Amino acid sequence: MAQSVPPGDIHTQPGSKIVFNAPYDDKHTYHIKITNAGGRRIGWAIKTTNMKRLGVDPPCGVLDPKENVLMAVSCDTFDATREDINNDRITIEWTNTPDGAAKQFRREWFQGDGMVRRKNLPIEYNL
């Protein structure tokens, strides 16, 4: 029954983008707080547009209502003068968990006919 109700909102801190500052010859890590602002348990997963440069830990999880998680987004070393840095972003996807499901993330929650919501956080690189 959980799949017939759209997933509630999430809040992220920061709310609209992630900024990494030069120099890029050392690994940078930025923390994002994700809060389940809805009234149902959700499963969430992170996707990135640049798997080679951007890492996410943890990459997925489960949040009860009003619960939050601190997630690390890391940017590996790269040459900003020779690589395209214009379209990087991370996308947070979330969906309601099935009623009675254990609090353990399952990829198949995102593959059924239930509604999946998305929030994009663009990555900005200051040179």
Swiss-Prot record:
MSP domain span: 9-126
InterPro entries, alphabetized: Ig-like_fold (IPR013783), MSP_dom (IPR000535), Nematode_MSP (IPR051155), PapD-like_sf (IPR008962)
Tissue-specificity statement: Sperm.
Sorted UniProt keywords: Acetylation, Cell projection, Cytoplasm, Cytoskeleton
PROSITE patterns to which the protein is assigned, alphabetical: MSP
Cellular component terms (Gene Ontology): cytoplasm; cytoskeleton; pseudopodium
N-acetylalanine modifications at: A2
Pfam families noted in UniProt: Motile_Sperm (PF00635)
Keyword Cytoplasm attached: yes
Subcellular locations according to the entry: Cell projection, Pseudopodium; Cytoplasm, Cytoskeleton
Superkingdom of source: Eukaryota
PANTHER family: MAJOR SPERM PROTEIN, MSP DOMAIN-CONTAINING PROTEIN-RELATED
Function: Central component in molecular interactions underlying sperm crawling. Forms an extensive filament system that extends from sperm villipoda, along the leading edge of the pseudopod.
Protein name as catalogued: Major sperm protein 2
